[in-house]
């Protein structure tokens, strides 16, 4: 027992069913770094990344940039890739975001503050986009991408 609660990348977790079940049934998180894993060729094809299996089998996951300076990417790019490649639902996107707070290294009191603030902001966001004019409202939200998003994903933000 190493005492870890967060596992970086976790690409090979699928190869050990006992470990996968322990990750699911205990308080562990897998940090998912899709762009890094693609560029480092940790997976032969990003469509084969185990992330959606982990997420949908109940293993706590969060999205991360890994090394945004090295890969010229940001969190927007990571979320875009996750949604585009794995057809994430809104609930799945929210779950990965909540996990980021729940498994952070912050003190418990700060975690609670951050989660409460996130829930508040998320409620406001959802109310803005729940109406019939959600496309107009969304068009006004500034999104930022770096070179990876522009070049690899062909985003024009």
Can you say where each PLM-predicted feature lies in the sequence?
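Active-site core of metal-dependent hydrolases
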Residues: 1-41
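Alpha-helix capping and helix-loop boundary segments enriched in small/acidic/polar residues
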Residues: 10-14, 41-45, 69-70, 84, ...
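Charged helix-capping and loop-helix junction motifs
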Residues: 44-52, 78
């Amino acid at each position: 027992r190493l005492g870890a609660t967060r596992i970086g990348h976790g690409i090979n977790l699928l190869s050990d069913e006992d470990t996968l079940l322990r990750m699911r049934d205990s308080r562990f998180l897998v940090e998912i770094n899709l762009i890094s894993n693609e560029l480092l060729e940790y997976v032969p094809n990003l469509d084969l990344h185990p992330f959606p299996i982990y997420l949908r089998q109940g293993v706590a996951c969060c999205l991360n940039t890994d090394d945004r300076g090295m890969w010229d990417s940001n969190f927007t790019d990571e979320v875009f890739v996750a949604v585009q490649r794995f057809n994430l639902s809104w609930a799945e996107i929210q779950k990965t975001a909540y996990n980021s707070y729940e498994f952070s290294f912050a003190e418990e009191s700060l975690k609670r503050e951050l989660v409460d603030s996130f829930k508040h902001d998320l409620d406001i966001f959802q109310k803005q986009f729940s109406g019939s004019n959600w496309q107009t409202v969304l068009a006004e939200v500034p999104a930022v991408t770096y070179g990876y998003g522009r070049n690899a994903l062909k985003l024009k933000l």
